[in-house]
């Protein structure tokens, strides 16, 4: 094919800085000149026509042209110097998909693969909800995460170990081992376009696994469950991230990415909720306690211990009043130093007063008389 010897712009006969209109004009002229209907039986003309269409497709597409201008033909093919890996490297399914058994083929058939730098696979984020009390006290727990690892049955080869490699792997029945398929479609009356595309049956490899591994089904990796020790420092903020380098899914031909565990609070414990380093809760008291005072109350903290709040006689609590108790909030974790400090945030208690639904009888009468008797004093409060 001409692509091996000429650049896309040389094929169309345009300059390096050709505009879109110049490219379209050259394309129209060349397709008329090299159209197979005008050159019956001329294989060179047919190949030239295919190359002209391919060159036009690249140069008329902004993204492909950007890659071509930056990296040339090798960039389009994903070879060294381009933005992607070559055929059979990366993720399965696309033009830049990884070759799930490329090294097997090379070992069998003597191929020499390009020595690209190993790319990293994607990282995995795992959100885990823990009790607020665990953020307060700190601690550790074991987390089980399903991950993909090199298949233990076929040792990552992809084929059934009962068979030898040369018997387990065959030429692709769809593309005949070429790794490509020629797709033809009509672009205008009397004009047909042929596109040479990587075969989707073998992902452009030209070979397929005939006898696949019963465990991984030819994927070379299989799912297993691994245990990870999660350590939570006291006072760790919500959204605290714990990383495990190179422990994400193993992908053939790539370096495994990271597992990132993100900690979130499952909900309030002992009635507490959190905002940064401070804790919040609501407490209900009676009308008598609100008006007369002279009481003590123990409130359970997130570590199971208790703190005491109290009111002296005659100290009134208003509905909705919020009380701040210093140094009773969350332990303060220093993200920069990566350790828990001795300082604590504050605890905030919002007081709710429980009023009776209705007053009646002697109680209503006596209370009314009391207010009338001390009406002036209430006005002065």
UniProtKB/Swiss-Prot annotation:
The lineage of its organism: Eukaryota, Fungi, Dikarya, Ascomycota, Taphrinomycotina. A motif (Prevents secretion from ER) lies at residues 378-381. Residues 5-74 form the J domain. The keyword Repeat applies. The gene is spj1. PROSITE patterns: DNAJ_1 (PS00636), DNAJ_2 (PS50076), ZF_CR (PS51188). Residues 78-93 have a biased composition (Gly residues). One of its GO terms (molecular function) is zinc ion binding. SMART domains: DnaJ (SM00271). The keyword Chaperone applies. CXXCXGXG motif repeats lie at residues 151-158, 172-179, 199-206, 213-220. GO terms for biological process: cellular response to unfolded protein; ERAD pathway; protein folding in endoplasmic reticulum; protein refolding; protein transport. InterPro entries: DnaJ_C (IPR002939), DnaJ_domain (IPR001623), DnaJ_domain_CS (IPR018253), DNJA1/2-like (IPR044713), HSP40/DnaJ_pept-bd (IPR008971), HSP_DnaJ_Cys-rich_dom (IPR001305), HSP_DnaJ_Cys-rich_dom_sf (IPR036410), J_dom_sf (IPR036869). Residues 72-93 are annotated as: Disordered. It comes from Schizosaccharomyces pombe (strain 972 / ATCC 24843) (Fission yeast). Coiled coil: none annotated. SUPFAM superfamilies: Chaperone J-domain (SSF46565), DnaJ/Hsp40 cysteine-rich domain (SSF57938), HSP40/DnaJ peptide-binding domain (SSF49493). One of its GO terms (cellular component) is endoplasmic reticulum lumen. Transmembrane segments: none annotated. A zinc finger (CR-type) spans 138-225. It is found in: Endoplasmic reticulum. This is DnaJ-related protein spj1. Keywords: Chaperone, Endoplasmic reticulum, Metal-binding, Protein transport, Repeat, Transport, Zinc, Zinc-finger. Pfam families: DnaJ, DnaJ_C, DnaJ_CXXCXGXG.
């Amino acid at each position: 094919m001409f692509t091996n010897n000429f650049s896309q712009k040389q094929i169309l006969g345009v300059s390096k800085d050709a505009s879109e209109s110049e490219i379209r004009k050259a394309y129209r002229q060349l397709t008329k000149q090299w159209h197979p209907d005008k050159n019956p039986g001329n294989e060179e003309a047919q190949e030239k026509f295919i190359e002209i269409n391919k060159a036009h497709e690249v140069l008329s597409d902004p993204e492909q042209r950007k890659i071509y201008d930056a990296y040339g033909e090798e960039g389009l093919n994903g070879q060294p110097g381009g933005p992607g890996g070559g055929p059979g490297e990366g993720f399965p399914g696309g033009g830049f998909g990884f070759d799930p058994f490329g090294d097997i083929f090379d070992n069998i058939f003597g191929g020499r693969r390009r020595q690209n730098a190993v790319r990293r696979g994607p990282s995995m984020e795992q959100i885990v909800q823990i009790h607020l009390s665990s953020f307060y006290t700190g601690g550790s727990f074991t987390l089980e995460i399903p991950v993909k690892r090199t298949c233990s049955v076929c040792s990552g080869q992809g084929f059934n170990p009962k068979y030898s490699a040369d018997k387990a792997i065959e030429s692709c029945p769809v593309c005949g081992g070429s790794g490509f398929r020629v797709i033809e479609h009509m672009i205008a009356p009397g004009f047909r376009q042929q596109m040479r595309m990587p075969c989707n049956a073998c992902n452009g490899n030209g070979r397929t696994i005939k006898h696949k591994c019963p465990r991984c089904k030819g994927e070379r990796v299989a799912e297993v469950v691994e245990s990870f020790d999660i350590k939570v420092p006291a006072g760790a903020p919500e959204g605290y991230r714990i990383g495990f380098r190179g422990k994400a899914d193993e992908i053939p031909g790539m370096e495994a990415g990271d597992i990132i565990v993100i900690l979130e609070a499952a909900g309030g414990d002992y009635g507490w909720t959190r905002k940064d380093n401070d804790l919040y809760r609501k407490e209900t008291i009676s009308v008598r306690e609100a008006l007369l005072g002279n009481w003590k109350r123990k409130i359970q903290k997130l570590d199971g211990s208790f703190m005491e709040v109290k009111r002296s006689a005659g100290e009134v609590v208003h509905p909705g009043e919020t009380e701040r108790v210093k140094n009773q909030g969350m332990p303060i974790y220093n993200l920069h130093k990566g350790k828990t400090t001795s300082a604590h945030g504050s605890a905030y208690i919002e007081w709710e007063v429980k009023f009776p639904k209705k007053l009646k009888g002697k109680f209503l009468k006596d209370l009314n008389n009391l207010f009338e008797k001390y009406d002036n004093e209430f006005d002065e409060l």
